[in-house]
């Protein structure tokens, strides 16, 4: 006779089923529809006079965060573990298209080219996801990106306003936001 599932296993399975349906739908509608193979701003894909329809970095980070959480939750569940592990390279490459090197530091920028804005809060959340991916996989490439973000955050860490990390790189206003300081 089969061993009945414990309640937490039933809940986890139900959660994963629903999360998988949502992520699969989102990816089918809003991921990989352009040459950059990343998250798109709208469904259906729409371009405008200033941008090609790919989402800006905070939306890329949100998609990455959802993926990382689902990937972690799927470990040990054969129906989902391989599916989400197999997407790791694609998600990693997608977000890394937004890395720029300005002011002698590499970090994730709003758009994927040098000379545009970079925000400390967007970077800290991506850095946390990279650290989580490292914890899940033990692959150094994720740890390297988390360290890159940490090095960038330390440039924005000032003693003004009682200390903390600035919200935006340039212009470096003296304001600090919880979204950039608290997670760091």
Positions of the model-derived regions?
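Residue-level recognition of alpha-helix boundary/capping or hinge positions
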Residues: 1-3, 184
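Low-complexity, Ser/Thr/Pro/Gly-enriched N-terminal "stalk/linker" regions
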Residues: 3-113, 140-164
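Well-ordered alpha-helical segments within folded domains of soluble proteins
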Residues: 52-72, 118-134, 176-184
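The feature captures the catalytic groove of carbohydrate-active enzymes
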Residues: 103, 118, 131-135, 153-184
